[in-house]
Amino acid sequence: MYELINNFEKKQMKKNIPHLHPGDTVEVKTWVIEGSKKRLQIFEGVVISIKNRGLHSAFTVRKISSGEGVERVFQSHSPVIEEIKIKRFGIVRRAKLYYLRSLSGKSARIKVRMNP
């Protein structure tokens, strides 16, 4: 039974997911259905946490929109996600960047890593 579930989950996993790190600035394109229309929506922000659990892996992206912090959790292997693009590589010393929630302005900046 366990092998059956494992095989099914492996078939469902996406192969083209980039290797994300906390502190990276990413652009996530997702499909949004509004009424009868289907369109791509872009969410760009900093990866503040990553949870690696096989098919159930997820990552949290945070951005500041109109002065308010917005966080969104994406399932890595979701069929709703069209593309994940890394815009900038960040240098941080923590695995979870939850402390960014209480920072704003220049103190919330993350150093840029030049080579991936």
Swiss-Prot record:
List GO molecular-function terms, semicolon-separated: structural constituent of ribosome
Keyword Repeat listed: no
User: Does the keyword section mention Transcription?
Assistant: no
Q: Which Pfam families match?
A: Ribosomal_L19
**GO process terms (BP):** translation
- List where this protein forms a coiled coil: none
Query: PROSITE patterns this protein is in?
Result: RIBOSOMAL_L19 (PS01015)
GO CC annotation: cytosolic large ribosomal subunit
Gene3D superfamilies, per the entry? 2.30.30.790
Q: Which UniProt keywords apply?
A: Ribonucleoprotein, Ribosomal protein
Record family assignment: Belongs to the bacterial ribosomal protein bL19 family.
Q: What does this protein do?
A: This protein is located at the 30S-50S ribosomal subunit interface and may play a role in the structure and function of the aminoacyl-tRNA binding site.
**What name goes with this protein?**
Large ribosomal subunit protein bL19
Biological source species: Blochmanniella pennsylvanica (strain BPEN)
